[in-house]
Amino acid sequence: MTTTTNIINNGVSSFSLNNNSNIPTIHSPSNPIVDCIRDGTMAYIYLVDESYIQQQHQPNPKFPSLIPLPKKLYSTTPNKTTPYPFQFQQNNENLSIVKEIYNYINCFEIKDCRDFHCVDSIKRYARFHLNLTLKFMGCKSIHARQISNTVFEQLEKCRIEQNKQLTATNNNAIVTTDSITKTEQSTTTTTTTTTTTTTTTATTTTQPPIYCVSIQRNIFYYIIGHILSCYQYSKPQYIIDFPVSCEVQDKKHSFTILLGGTSGCGKSTLTALLASRIGFTAVISTDNIRQLLRKFISRQESPILWASTYHAGEIISNPSLSHKEKILQGYEAQNEMIFNKLDILIGHYEKRKESLIVEGVHLDTKLILRLVKKHPSCIPFLMYISNEAKHKERFAIRSKYMTLDPHQNKYTKYFKNIRIINDHLCHGADEHMIPQIDNTSIDRSLATIHGTIFACLKRKVQCGESYYNHETDKMNMLYNQYEQIQHQFWSSKGMLRLIQKKKTVSPHGNNNVTGDVDNNNSNSNNNNVNNNNGDNNGDSNVDNNSNDNDNNNNNSNNISNINNDNDNNNNDNDNSNVDNNNDNSDNSVNSNNSINSNNGNEGSNNCNVVNGNNSNSDILIKVEYNKNNNSSSNDNEYKNSNDNHCNIKNETENSDINGCINNNIISYNNNIKNNTDNTTGNHNYTTMNGNNENDCKNNNNNNNIKTIPNEGQQQPQQQPQQQPPQQSQQQPQLQQKKQQIQEEQQNLNNNNKSIEDDEEAFNSDDEHDHEDDSIRGNESGSVGDHGNSVKKSSLNDKNHNNGNNQSNEDNDDDSDISDSDSDGGERIDYYLDCGSLGS
């Protein structure tokens, strides 16, 4: 900083800046002095208003022109529908190829320019000023710098091309005559040699010229709009926003930002970043004003001034007041002492049309309203932290010993008083519609404030609206713009819901029978489920995903596939989707699903099934295996819906089992007892699962069990539906079914011992290898457009010995131990099950 100041004070020329080897750090692309003064290139752009050019184009102007003006004038009509005199090529930033542009620009050296600061119709822009203007209108920092450099480079090309045209014109105008004698030619040659030597020596000592260009303001806006479109800023709003940003840069309009809030809510950090982002360095804190007042007022004269805002109420000795009333009364008393000086400061900045940022805890709602009524350029915001725990953690950084101990951290000691002031400010902001920003994400808060400021300023410039409504005593226009900007910046949870909605695929009902199998492992089973209902045919989609199988094929592929024929006129569940996901295991799951609903009178089973007046239901069955307990947890969730869909989801993870699902009954390494009632033809399936016993009966339902060939073999075609046979004709079939079920039961019993041995070997493995696969977050989302919902319960934690599910509740604030000012402000562990939600 001292080097730059010495350069300015000592009057070092731009030529010495570029050629002096003693100052290697000055000549850098990031130095603002080098950006403003570049020898031999385009350094400044002079923007001239249309009215000034019209005055100078008159026959007898009153005042001589301060700068060289363009040859032609682009006159606009009041309705601003006049087309531009030339057109640019789309996505081509080269301006020199447009020949008509040379009539509306004029390049000259800086020595030909007079003092123009006395005229408001002429403004000068360097690269640095144009960069700030683009950043204020909303361009990214890197794009703003690239666009500003591109504008100056293209105008430099136009200057070079214009000089070439002038040189060619002058060469054509020179007429050489043959009447010159040889003696005259010899004398001219001798004089030219001497003059050339003197000129060469002179050029080595003189400085290179600094070039400038004068351009009409409307033409300049047109050029900037074309360059912006080349950098993907092609929306019409950017072309409209740039003139507003230029008016603020030219000090035709100004604003004062007021950032209030309690201690520790991030006001100072946000103010510094905001000033750097919008390019305005005038920042004042109310704490600095209080510190200046302390230099002139002693502690004995005003003890409240020397106290902090959160314990100024301790000085008030009124026993009739409560603790909360004392805190607020002392806080407001100190604010009154700051108001007078702050009012005078804002008034001086408004007179000079300069923008200012004021932040501090003393900006309560009453003081803000008084400033807004007196100074229309004020734009207030209230910063707060909704989560008390996160608010308290911030004070550990500000403490001298980096601790939250109340004996060593004064902020923690008076934290209750700070929260009392925070609630008081939020209540006043709600009453007067002052925008409140939960500063848990510094990036989102910064973008929201910047967008709101520019949107309000644009409405004030274009429409003349005021931020404050004197009739309602509220900040109506400011709050409306804040709400619009707030919806544009999505939170991470909102974006998560959008991703879930796009990823999920709703199952659509068809009138034919389909069996879809997706196998991702050679050791997994090939499961085909075929459902034939008496009234309608349904869809059966089976997705079997097996990953990271650590066991042999002996533990799987032992259970045959079952074809379920349900002949029941009261069965309205036409569509059945079965999703079986097997992770880190070799599992064989047979699904035999039949659901009967007698118009809501009684259910088909007694496994916590809720049937309403509609026979449709969404069923989620999730099988979980706790590795530490060597047991399974069965979570059955049933939900009614209005669609003819039945969604059944079965997930088995971190297990090595053979499970069988028959009529919504989950069999886990247990024997199946089958009791057949020959008189009625109904089957009663009883499953023993640990200490739990689930009995499910199918009334007036005849189940035909058939074997379906494995994948690779040709499946039989669907037979046309027939009427159910008489009871007497079904007795041999029932006996055959019973025999088949007994054979399958015997196979299960034979494999039971080998499975238990594999389970013991599996449980002895290191739990660290599967730690990442057992801990996942809970997730919920809407599926499809048919009203079907898919519910997921979280996996059991391996480090716990119970089978209870864990769920993570979404909070608006940070739930991690990371800093709340990090990017995004929220950390969400998000997993999508591609097998269940579709591709």
Curated annotation (Swiss-Prot):
The keyword Coiled coil applies. Residues 726-764 form a coiled coil. The lineage of its organism: Eukaryota, Amoebozoa, Evosea, Eumycetozoa, Dictyostelia. Residues 636-646, 765-776 have a biased composition (Basic and acidic residues). It comes from the Eukaryota. This is Uncharacterized protein DDB_G0273453/DDB_G0273565. Residues 504-611, 627-646, 682-839 are annotated as: Disordered. The keyword Coiled coil applies. SUPFAM superfamilies: P-loop containing nucleoside triphosphate hydrolases. Residues 509-611, 689-704, 713-753 have a biased composition (Low complexity). Residues 809-823 have a biased composition (Acidic residues). It comes from Dictyostelium discoideum. Keywords: Coiled coil.
